[in-house]
Amino acid sequence: MKTGILLTLCYDGSNYHGWINQTNSISTQTVLNKAIKKVIKTSEFKTIGASKTDANVHALDQKVLLIIYFTPILEKFINAINKALPEDIRILNAKFVDPNFNIREVDYKIYNYYINDHKFDIFTNRYEYFWKHSKIDILKLQEIFNLFIGEHEFKLFSGLKENEWDNYQTKRIIDDIKVLRINNKVVIQFKATGFIRYQIRIIIANCLNAYLNYKVNINTLTEMLQGIGKKTPFIIKAKGLVLQEIKFK
C-alpha cells in the first residue's frame, strides 16, 4: 500500500551542499533519506522536496513529500526519524496526503535574506550577511528592488550558463519584494511561485552594488531585465538566505 506523508522540515544549511542528493557531497535530502532508511529498514521509499535550496541556504518551512509502502503511527514514526537526524535538521510536523500529491504545485514561496548593518554578532553571523558600509537606507534600497517586481527576463540574473537559457523558463514573475528593518537587521523578502538557480542572491548583490553606485546603476539593471547586456559577476553569500514559507494552491 502506497502512503504519502507531507513533511514540514527546517534545517541549518551551513553544513550541506543544498537540498538535492549529491554524488560527492552531503545534502539535506541525503541525510534525511539516511535517517528514514535507518527507521524503516528499507530503501523502498522516496522523498521529493518542494524547493531546491542551494548550498548553505537555510529553511524554516521546506515541504517534503515522503512516499512509503506501509501506514505508520505518524507521531511515533516522525519522532523516530527526528531521533535519527542530526541536530541541524528537524521535522516540525507531518500529515498524511495522497501519494500523488503534487509537491511542486505551489501558490507561492517566500525567501528572506538577512543583512546585519548594525554590529557584528558572532552568534548570528552564520545566518546573515554583515554589511561593512554605513547604515542602509531601506527606502532608497526598496526603490531599486521595485524594478524587479512583476514579469521580467531574468536570464542575466541567474546562475544559468548561456547554453542553458533555452532549456529553462527565464521569463518569470516576482510577485513582491519587500525591504524591511527588523531588530537592527535588514530583511529582504521575495515572494514568487519559484526562482531560477541563484536568482535571489544575484539580484540582491546587483541591487546592493547599485545602491552603492558600484559598477551597476538603475539603467544597467533596467536593461539587464530586458535581456540586454551581459551578466555581472556579483552574487551575495548564501548564508543569509532562508526559505521562510511555502504555500500550496
From Swiss-Prot:
InterPro entries: PsdUridine_synth_cat_dom_sf, PsdUridine_synth_TruA, PsdUridine_synth_TruA_a/b_dom, PsdUridine_synth_TruA_C, TruA/RsuA/RluB/E/F_N. Keywords: Isomerase, tRNA processing. The active site is at 54 (nucleophile). Substrate binds at residue 111. It catalyses: uridine(38/39/40) in tRNA = pseudouridine(38/39/40) in tRNA. GO terms for molecular function: RNA binding; tRNA pseudouridine(38-40) synthase activity. One of its GO terms (biological process) is tRNA pseudouridine synthesis. Belongs to the tRNA pseudouridine synthase TruA family. Formation of pseudouridine at positions 38, 39 and 40 in the anticodon stem and loop of transfer RNAs. This is tRNA pseudouridine synthase A. The lineage of its organism: Bacteria, Bacillati, Mycoplasmatota, Mollicutes, Mycoplasmataceae. The gene is truA.
